[in-house]
Amino acid sequence: MSLALPSEGGCQCGEIRYRLTGEPVWLAVCHCNDCKMQSGGVFGMSLRMREADVKLISGEPKCWTRPSENGGRAKNCYFCGTCGIRLWHTGGLGFLSIKPGTLDDSSLLAPRYEGWTKRKVPWLTIDGLEVSHYTQPGTAARG
């Protein structure tokens, strides 16, 4: 996984812009229902970043707080109030999960992990993954 630094991204209408100044921790694909719904697709993706390495350049995102599907801690979800694009959500403990599709250039990124494979659509294959989790990473049930 590689990302030219600094990298910038933002929402679809351009009202909100951000800059990434540090290396990503990881990029993951998630097949949980929450990620499917927020992405509008059959999976979601999250680029884990240290909160200190994410700088807001312009605009002010709106925030919606939702409970976690697996009963874990609630997540604060940040999005553009004008175009509605989800930009990131809190990952806990000083981390943010950036939606990589909001980056100006995500062409060098490739996921290494996937979670919630028990909810993965059967026709999807993602090459190059190092780790797959049957449910939530960190739980006993792994696939």
Describe these PLM feature segments:
Residues M1-G143:
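A short Gly-Trp-Pro
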